[in-house]
Amino acid sequence: MKTSLRLEDGTKNSLQIPIDLIIEIFLRLSVNSIARCRCVSKQWASTLSRPYFTELFLTRSLARPKLLFAYRKGSDYLFLSSPQLQNPDDDHKKSSPVVVNYHMHHILTLGSGNMSWRTIQCCIPHRSFDGGICIDGLIYYYAGVNNNDIVIVCFDVRSEEFRFIIGALHHGSLINYNGKLSLYLPSTVYSRFNGVIRSIKLWVLEDAKRQEWSEHTYILPAMHDIMKTTDLRCVGMTQTKEFVFWSIKGMRFYVFYYNIERNTIKKVEMQGMEAFKESNVYTFLDHVEDVKLMQFF
């Protein structure tokens, strides 16, 4: 690939830049920047649409997952992302069911060529709650059945079948623990997490068919100086076995990382979010950018 530089005497000097270097520069850009670069020229559009580049971009993106913040104000949403700390102690996929009523469910499969909603049936009428999670193609979420009995629903996006985990031990936050469904429970009646909490429990679903759970208890380090009495919400667990919590305290937004192996707490301030302190905020882990999805829109 060639580029031209204008010298002081007004002449131009064409430079040959290795394509590998160009690709490496593009790989460091965000999806939004890649979209703009595709509009620069046909050559750039061709280069950035090649399978080699899109696969390599996804591989790099998987190695550096991000935190995704979604702000809701009225009917409007604003999405922001921030690098997800991979080692905080050193400072440093898609179908989704949408419940319409007790009996009907709609799904939309991205990338299938047929961008339309389809209706599927479920054998047990239920009403879904917030806080679902997707693990290896299985979507888990809480739901109410019969007289508002609480169950965990498992929807397989491949077979489009529903399964039910009846008699869930506790109504805790659904998180991904080493590829297994887990329930996070702080040691309080009100399921709050703050600086005075001394331990947390994790129930791990070891066998979905037999509905067998294992219990894990973690004794927390002294952390009142870091968290005070601020109530936090559990976002989930990273692939490096770190619980992630978030909280808005006054004008500031904080993310806390608890490493269960090192038994340490790390507090990170997310700057630039002061304008959204009065908005409803949703935080998601392991956000990965994929430039291949831009080809469908």
From Swiss-Prot:
Write down a Pfam family by its short name.
FBA_3
Give every F-box domain span.
11-60
The record's annotation in InterPro entries points to: F-box-assoc_dom_typ3, F-box-assoc_interact_dom, F-box-like_dom_sf, F-box_dom
Top-level taxon of origin: Eukaryota
Which positions make up the signal peptide?
none
Q: Which CDD domains match?
A: F-box_AtFBW1-like
Report the PANTHER family cross-referenced here.
BNAA05G37150D PROTEIN-RELATED, E3 UBIQUITIN-PROTEIN LIGASE SGIP1
- The protein here is known as Putative F-box protein At2g19630
